[in-house]
């Protein structure tokens, strides 16, 4: 078993060096191992880089389609674009939590969970509501995640519809 772990770590290190060499990123590239990941050889870039990909895709989608589609359409398109970039994307992930030793299953759905690290809540309504950010922060806390976004595609200007939510665990 230990030999398998050592081999996996050696392969990880080789992959990191190869990516740095190809991209010219040097030591500034931050990679972390993600056990459950089935993408990019088991590696995922740091959450800020993933967050940038999410926002870049959201802006491209909003530029192309505007604010007239249903939330489901934006979710499917955004998930498809992020997968195309090599991210692990779980759509409408059913989640639960524990409280006082009791497990509560199937209590809420996260619109998108990207690379098992970023919660994305999507909306397609004409105004921003404070409850959207509260909902996202609650999901971050229950899932023990650090970063989330509320993206409201219903706003005429997408920059007015994006909220970055940080959970200071």
Spans of features found by a protein language model:
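Nucleic-acid nuclease catalytic cores
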Residues: 123-169
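Solvent-exposed, charged helical/coil patches
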Residues: 26-88, 137, 164-169
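Gly/Ser/Thr-rich beta-alpha loop segments that engage phosphate groups in nucleotides
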Residues: 68-70, 103, 156
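A short acidic/basic microdomain associated with nuclease active sites
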Residues: 83-100
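Short, low-complexity, charge-dense intrinsically disordered segments
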Residues: 1-43
């Amino acid at each position: 078993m230990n030999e398998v772990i050592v081999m996996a770590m050696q392969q990880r290190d080789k992959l990191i060096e190869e990516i740095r060499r190809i991209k010219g990123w040097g030591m500034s590239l931050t990679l972390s191992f993600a056990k459950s990941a089935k993408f990019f050889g088991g590696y995922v870039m740091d959450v800020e880089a993933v967050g940038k990909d999410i926002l870049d895709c959201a802006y491209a989608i909003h530029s192309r389609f505007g604010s007239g589609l249903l939330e489901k359409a934006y979710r499917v398109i955004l998930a498809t674009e992020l997968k195309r970039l090599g991210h692990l994307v779980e759509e409408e992930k059913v989640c639960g939590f524990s409280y006082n030793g009791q497990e509560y299953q199937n209590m809420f759905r996260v619109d998108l969970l990207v690379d098992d690290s970023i919660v994305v809540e999507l909306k397609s309504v004409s105004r921003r509501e404070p409850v959207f950010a509260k909902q996202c922060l609650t999901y971050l806390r229950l899932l023990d995640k650090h970063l989330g976004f509320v993206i409201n595609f219903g706003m005429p200007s997408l920059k007015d519809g994006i909220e970055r939510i940080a959970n200071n665990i």
